[in-house]
């Protein structure tokens, strides 16, 4: 069983697409889905609660930022592995969860598995070698030290171990970084530095399973 966490911030049309496509193609049993809504707007998800009664929506006021939202979500996760999403990704096909799990179970030093299309990796290079997990899943490793500061950590669609988070971040992500709406990528970099220092790397599947929906639809402060 896998718990699923989704961060959302006022883009309910995209959130709806994200949830619908994920549910359509999820290929492992889901325990619980949690959505943290950080728009600060009451009632914004009322229509989605009707569409998705199985989802627990967390809707605090005021806004807290993505880092504290993630920490809140992860405090609710009870499964060994969890899948994390943002509100602006569409899932394209099935098989990504089982393949990601194969990699994480085969390689304890891999912290997450990317699902992005090759042209949506923001230029982040991968190592040329192709590896196989225990059940045959092919993957590559995401290069560390890209532009001197990117090590492969992403808050986008990935499967992760809850134990890694609890071990490396005893005070949560908020213990090592804060969310800056003007430079939201900096928190990913700072969290990534912790993973790199501990010897972790990110992997990517050979084929892309998700596509970004949010180009030009940035969250507001």
Model-derived features: where do they sit?
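N-proximal low-complexity "stem/linker" segments adjacent to membrane-targeting elements
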Residues: 1-20
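C-terminal catalytic/acceptor-binding lobe
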Residues: 17, 150-221
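Short, acidic, metal-binding catalytic loop of nucleotide-sugar glycosyltransferases
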Residues: 21-30
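A conserved acidic beta->alpha catalytic loop
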Residues: 37-45
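A short, glycine-/small-residue-rich helix N-cap motif at loop->alpha-helix starts
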Residues: 61-68, 74, 92
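Short aromatic/hydrophobic "clamp" motif used to bind/position activated sugar donors
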Residues: 82
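Conserved donor-nucleotide/metal-binding helix-loop-beta segment in metal-dependent transferases, i.e.
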Residues: 94-115
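Short beta-strand-to-loop element that shapes/binds the nucleotide-sugar donor at the catalytic cleft/hinge
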Residues: 113-128
């Amino acid at each position: 069983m896998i718990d699923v966490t989704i961060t959302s911030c006022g883009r309910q049309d995209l959130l709806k697409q994200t949830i619908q496509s994920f549910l359509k193609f999820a290929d492992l049993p889901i325990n619980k889905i949690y959505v943290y809504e950080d728009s600060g707007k009451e009632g914004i998800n009322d229509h989605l609660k009707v569409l998705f009664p199985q989802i627990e929506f967390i809707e605090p006021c005021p806004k807290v930022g993505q880092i504290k939202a993630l920490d809140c979500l992860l405090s609710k996760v009870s499964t060994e592995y969890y899948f994390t999403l943002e509100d602006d990704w569409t899932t394209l096909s099935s098989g990504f969860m089982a393949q990601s799990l194969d990699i994480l179970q085969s390689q304890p030093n891999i912290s997450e598995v990317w699902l992005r299309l090759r042209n949506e990796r923001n230029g982040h290079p991968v190592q040329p070698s192709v590896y196989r997990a225990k059940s045959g899943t092919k993957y590559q490793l995401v290069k560390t030290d890209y532009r001197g500061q990117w090590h492969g950590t992403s808050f986008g669609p990935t499967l992760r171990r809850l134990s890694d988070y609890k071990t490396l971040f005893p005070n949560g992500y908020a213990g090592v970084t804060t969310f800056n709406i003007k430079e939201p990528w900096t928190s990913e970099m700072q969290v990534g530095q912790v993973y790199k220092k501990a010897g972790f790397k990110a992997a990517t599947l050979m084929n892309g399973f998700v596509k970004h929906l949010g180009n030009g639809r940035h969250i507001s402060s």
